[in-house]
Amino acid sequence: MLSVGFNIAINATTQGVPKIIESLFPNLPNFIAHLLATIVLVIVLAKLVYKPYKQMIEKQRQKITEVLSDAIEKQTQANIKIKQANSLLEEAKTESVSIINTARVDAEIQKNKIIDNANLQAKNIQSYAQNSIKQEKIKAQLEIKNTIVNLAINSAEKILSKEIDKNTNKKLIEEFIKDLD
């Protein structure tokens, strides 16, 4: 039974094969002409279009490669310049800190000089004032002494009525004043 069904299927398919082939290839000379024309067209297109297309693609590839290598080179240069700029910036920061520290030290030195100078001037003024006071005190003491001596001489002259001369009287008064000091 199986063989009968299989034979029927084979007969049906073998009868239909020439029809399918006839449907696909209705005219064998036309098919061969079309096939040859297609092959010729593919060869001509390959020669005329593919080679220039391939050359154009290669040129584009070269341009892209050049652009990429140029971009890489420029990126490398930019990175180098960025590093240089960063190092210059660091140097500038270091230098500015150094300048600020130097300025602070100089300002501190200048401040100390000004303070020392002011203290020295104050001491000079104070010692001058003390010397002036001492001189004025000595001068005042001398004036008081002379006034006392003169008063004592005048009083003694009146009291003694001219019995003792002026030099002896003066010596007595000076001894009296020395004893008071």
From Swiss-Prot:
This is ATP synthase subunit b. Keywords: ATP synthesis, Cell membrane, CF(0), Hydrogen ion transport, Ion transport, Membrane, Transmembrane, Transmembrane helix, Transport. Belongs to the ATPase B chain family. It is found in: Cell membrane. It comes from Mycoplasma capricolum subsp. capricolum (strain California kid / ATCC 27343 / NCTC 10154). HAMAP family: ATP_synth_b_bprime (MF_01398). The gene is atpF. NCBIfam families: ATP_synt_b. One of its GO terms (molecular function) is proton-transporting ATP synthase activity, rotational mechanism. GO terms for cellular component: plasma membrane; proton-transporting ATP synthase complex. The chain crosses the membrane at residues 24-44. F-type ATPases have 2 components, F(1) - the catalytic core - and F(0) - the membrane proton channel. F(1) has five subunits: alpha(3), beta(3), gamma(1), delta(1), epsilon(1). F(0) has three main subunits: a(1), b(2) and c(10-14). The alpha and beta chains form an alternating ring which encloses part of the gamma chain. F(1) is attached to F(0) by a central stalk formed by the gamma and epsilon chains, while a peripheral stalk is formed by the delta and b chains. It holds the Pfam family ATP-synt_B. The keyword Zinc-finger does not apply. It is a single-pass membrane protein. F(1)F(0) ATP synthase produces ATP from ADP in the presence of a proton or sodium gradient. F-type ATPases consist of two structural domains, F(1) containing the extramembraneous catalytic core and F(0) containing the membrane proton channel, linked together by a central stalk and a peripheral stalk. During catalysis, ATP synthesis in the catalytic domain of F(1) is coupled via a rotary mechanism of the central stalk subunits to proton translocation.
